Structure formats: structure tokens, C-alpha cells
Amino acid sequence: MSQNPAHFSLLPALLILTALVTVAYWVSYFIGGDVRVVDARWYTAFESSFPIADAWLAVTAFISGIGLWRGTAWGPRAGLLAASALLYLAGMDITFDIENGLYALVPNSQPMQFELLINVWSAALGIVTLVVSWKRG
């Protein structure tokens, strides 16, 4: 990490954290259901279609976090993969939540509050990762 700017220490940590939280989310979703906003079939059908895509997100976030942390040449390239996965997830989730009126549940629903956090986190981290990786790569 010899010539990396200070934000390169934070970004890898956030990407690795994102990978770990993504795995924890799916464990909760399938085992306890605590993160489910509603139990209706239309909702679970949509959410249940994401584990493979989110696994890709977790893998690319973890790998890019390691690569950026170590200052490797491939770290920024992996960062572009992670950024695209984060932005795609944000776009899909935000569109679904708007079209189904789920943001109206935010004041009284902890799962929806967490969903909102995921939406903001994915969009913001996706943009930051894209910009940093593009400049670095």
C-alpha cells in the first residue's frame, strides 16, 4: 500500500464488510426471515431470485477489497466488477421498492429501514468504488 491515498485504506475495508454483510443477509433471509420486509409471495419471489447475483457481488467485493488493500494491479479491475454489481443491485432494489410502494413502510418497519440502508449503501459504495477503481486502473 505504499503509494495509495488514505481513502484506499477505507474503501477496501468497506468492500470486505459489504461482502460479509451480504452473506449474513442471506443467512438471515433463509433461516430466520428477519430481513424480509413482507412475507407475500410477490415479494419473496423477487427477493429469492437474488442469491446467485448477490454471491457474485460478495465475491467481487471481497476480492477487490483484498486487491485494493494490498495495492495490487488487479485490485482496481476487481473493483470495477464490484462497483457494477453494487450499482446493479441498487438499481434493481430501488426500482422494485418504488414500484411496490415499500418505502412507505420505512417509518414502522425495521426490515424496510435496513432495506433502505442497503439501497443507499449499494448506490454510494458502487459510485465511489467505480470512480476510485477507474482512476486507479
How does the language model describe each region?
Residues M1-G137:
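Topology signature of small-to-medium multi-pass alpha-helical membrane proteins
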